[in-house]
UniProtKB/Swiss-Prot annotation:
<dbReference type="GO" id="GO:0043922">
    <property type="term" value="P:negative regulation by host of viral transcription"/>
</dbReference>
<feature type="region of interest" description="Disordered">
    <location>
        <begin position="85"/>
        <end position="104"/>
    </location>
</feature>
<feature type="compositionally biased region" description="Basic and acidic residues">
    <location>
        <begin position="876"/>
        <end position="886"/>
    </location>
</feature>
<feature type="zinc finger region" description="C2H2-type 1">
    <location>
        <begin position="158"/>
        <end position="180"/>
    </location>
</feature>
<feature type="compositionally biased region" description="Basic and acidic residues">
    <location>
        <begin position="498"/>
        <end position="511"/>
    </location>
</feature>
<dbReference type="GO" id="GO:0097150">
    <property type="term" value="P:neuronal stem cell population maintenance"/>
</dbReference>
<dbReference type="GO" id="GO:0005737">
    <property type="term" value="C:cytoplasm"/>
</dbReference>
<feature type="compositionally biased region" description="Basic and acidic residues">
    <location>
        <begin position="451"/>
        <end position="482"/>
    </location>
</feature>
<feature type="region of interest" description="Required for binding to the neuron-restrictive silencer element">
    <location>
        <begin position="200"/>
        <end position="211"/>
    </location>
</feature>
<dbReference type="GO" id="GO:0008270">
    <property type="term" value="F:zinc ion binding"/>
</dbReference>
<feature type="region of interest" description="Interaction with RCOR1">
    <location>
        <begin position="981"/>
        <end position="1059"/>
    </location>
</feature>
<feature type="compositionally biased region" description="Basic residues">
    <location>
        <begin position="584"/>
        <end position="600"/>
    </location>
</feature>
<dbReference type="GO" id="GO:0002244">
    <property type="term" value="P:hematopoietic progenitor cell differentiation"/>
</dbReference>
<dbReference type="GO" id="GO:0000976">
    <property type="term" value="F:transcription cis-regulatory region binding"/>
</dbReference>
<dbReference type="GO" id="GO:0045471">
    <property type="term" value="P:response to ethanol"/>
</dbReference>
<dbReference type="GO" id="GO:0044877">
    <property type="term" value="F:protein-containing complex binding"/>
</dbReference>
<dbReference type="GO" id="GO:0006355">
    <property type="term" value="P:regulation of DNA-templated transcription"/>
</dbReference>
Amino acid sequence: MATQVMGQSSGGGSLFNNSGNMGMALPNDMYDLHDLSKAELAAPQLIMLANVALTGEVNGSCCDYLVGEERQMAELMPVGDNHFSDSEGEGLEESAELKGDPSGLDNMELRSLELSVVEPQPVFEASAAPEVYSSNKDPAPEAPVAEDKCKNLKAKPFRCKPCQYEAESEEQFVHHIRVHSAKKFFVEESAEKQAKARESGASPSEEGEFSKGPIRCDRCGYNTNRYDHYTAHLKHHLRAGDNERVYKCIICTYTTVSEYHWRKHLRNHFPRKVYTCSKCNYFSTEKNNYVQHVRTHTGERPYKCELCPYSSSQKTHLTRHMRTHSGEKPFKCDQCNYVASNQHEVTRHARQVHNGPKPLNCPHCDYKTADRSNFKKHVELHVNPRQFNCPVCDYAASKKCNLQYHFKSKHPTCPSKTMDVSKVKLKKTKRREADLHRDAAAAATEQTDTEQAKTKGVDASARRSERPVKGVGKDVPKEKKPCSNASVVQVTTRTRKSAVETKAAEGKHTDGQTGNNAEKSSKAKKSKRKMDAEAHPSVEPVTEGPVTKKKKTESKPKTSGEVPKGSRVEDRKADKQQSASIKKGGKKTALKTKTAKKGSKLAPKWVGHTEPSSEMAQGGESPVPALTQAVVTPSGSTQTELSSPMDIAQTEPAQMDVSQTGPPQVQRPLPVEPAQLEPSPPQEPPQVEPPACVEPPPPVEPPCPMEPAEMEPSPPMEPSQVEPPPHLEPPLPMELPQVELPPVEDCQKELPPVEHAQTKVAQTGPTQVGAVQEEPLFCLRATSSQANQKVISPKDRAKEKLSVLSEMARQEQVLIEVGLVPVRDSQLLKASKSAPDLPAPPSPLPKGHLRREETPKDQEMFSDGEGNKVSPLEKGGTEEAGESRAELAAPMESTSALSSEQSSNAPDGETLHSECQADSTAVCEMEVDTEQKTDRVPLKDSAVEPVSPLNPRVDPEAAAPAVVASPPITLAESQEIDEDEGIHSHDGSDLSDNMSEGSDDSGLHGARPAPQEATSKSGKEGLAVKVTEGEFVCIFCDRSFRKEKDYSKHLNRHLVNVYFLEEAAEEQE
């Protein structure tokens, strides 16, 4: 092609006017790029290769686009459709044909020599260029017009830019080129060989040699290492269409379909003038670029924005800036409607959104991106590896939530100390040290929390002061929510886990609804986070209901004793109907079966805990005294009169109320309120006792020892609402726990008289529990607030109880209709917290039955005692009542002691209130003792009664609370599950998702489809099992603890982690 162009030059036989010898350069002297090795080729940037003076104008007609172009243009043979081919063979053949023409051949040889000399100057440096051009600025202007060039060239000698050699004649210049090329370049002696080399694929091979990168255009051979440049290049092909012309530089691999860009490129190789910077090595053939560069040294910024202080050294920058004021966005993405004010923004958009080129490659891995900020963050992970490191393995996470998931999936059995994400600190460099510090801090915190909880509990019980209890609740919740919860609730000693879980859940709901945040700032934090997670599922129906229920529940405890049985019966009936509908749903049944199984397995452990921790559960009487003493210490009005099953049942309901109130108190840290509640409960228990006496207490106990707890919590709600129809209470199972306890409900039905009192008490407590379950955590706190209200005004309480009972029944019905579990469950959960005896009947009757079967008679007795308290409330089912009575026969023996304790606890409303206080004070002691006993008993419990994990304390008192407590545990579990779901379901934690879905109180039923109920059942069962496995079982990691202390600490960590995760999930949402 080049030969063709040169041969057709109209300037004469020779391109060099100064020399008439066209044949000086023999064919053997031809230089070509193809003959040069890759190392010998000059870099394209080294534009000053050789100002080869082409003396003739390029008027040739071989290429229309070359007409009128400078000689340099002729040298850089452009390739048109007619001339271009992938192999360049066509042009070479033409050049071979022209060999016969001496002028054409000589011209080509000369041009080739000049080009070859010019190209292969790897030695050439930018710094040299400035000197050459600065000294030779006059001869430089050879590019403008062919005619001008010819004139200039005629008057001036030939110059070799690389070495600054100047020749007066073409002959000298050619000779110099040969010498120069002999030193620097590989010289092809034969023009034929050179032509053959080109034809044989010199172009592909050389292009490969010259290629700047792995990206090559199949149509024109364009090479680049920039994908975006390649895509831009392809656009030229697309625009050119059939009339495409590819302009190719013969010196380098540059190709283009744009004549303008091709000409501009040629100036790099044959500049007519170079502007050099006197302060640096910068040089440019474009004056504008040179001027702009100089401004970088001078700091001149002549282009200023009229609308703002912005100024720029370049007009284009100012133009681009002005678009920020006008809002103009002329650049649009080719693949979508994205528009931007700058092209680079569109480019970045295409790379990120449309998987375009990602030039930013991580030097440490294969990560690629087009976003610089993301790139920096990614590289930071290599430089500063993940800050959150697993203390067990080498896993490191960049986020706490990821580390939390890692703990659950990879180290589910590891101790909570080690796995406490809340203790994880950012580690910039030393992972292990940070881990050690974190572990040590966690251990210290746990110890401190445990000691504080124990001390506070003891002080509270000794002082009977509500404030100390509150302090315990506050301090413990901060450090250990579980511990504080357990401390406040006497019966919850064994069920601390449940209490902790419930408190965590309650903290969430209660903090959101009751405004306990002020009382417990630490809990407020955690509970707020949990509430956010749980609030979505349960807040809609539960928020309103729980708040109202709180008030109602508060009024109930006050008036529960005063409330006529008829109203209670009506409430119970309503509750029973609701629970019946829920039971019909089948969700509760499944949960009951699963929970019953799990509860039966866990119940022995808890029973063991209950027996050793209280020893009174086994001793029967001794436990009662202990409970009674605990109650007396807080309220000072505790009565040990309740020795009969009825009394026990009543006492248990009172305890349930206390436990219910207690857990809320723990959450709310309202120790004083519990004390107040105690005085008012005394009124309630006495009033309730007559009805309780009317109903046979024994049947109450027989109902599922473990399940009764669950059943009872909901029945108490119903009884409080409708005491007369305790038999109607079977619907109460609407609460999942209640569903599990249908037999217990029957027993309760049979024991309506005894449990009417209990029902009243339970109504105060269990009813509240039901409300709490419906509105799990909110209701729990509501219960505590109710207890407070009871303490405040006993008379008002009686009045409020009536209204509250009816309202509670209505609310429960509404909640049930909405698909939420009645608050009773949550209250039961509270009760379970307060009554560790309660088997962990998270699941309904199934667990209760299993517990009964698996649970020894002693356990049954304990559970029966619990059943006595709750069963009447839970159900009026005659069958269950019969069973409970039958079971109560034996359990009543052990329950006799429980009843004595209960009698002491329940005889007076004060007993309940005192229990509340005891929950806050004595219960703290109880919890401490229970923790210690639990430490001993866990094994026994697991061996004795796997079914009733909540039975760690089988004390009569604990037994009754246990019945109520099991549902609370269910709530706690379900609530915590809900928390997990809020957090983990968001993150994809199967366990947490299932658990939370399975929890009726989770509030997820409204948010999620029915399958959740099944999951909630399984989740509750799993939680109950975990809680009841003869030890305190963590619902998060299935880890079991013999001591509530340890469990509370461990659970607190989970809860803290859950808060973090919930926050993250909320932020993402």
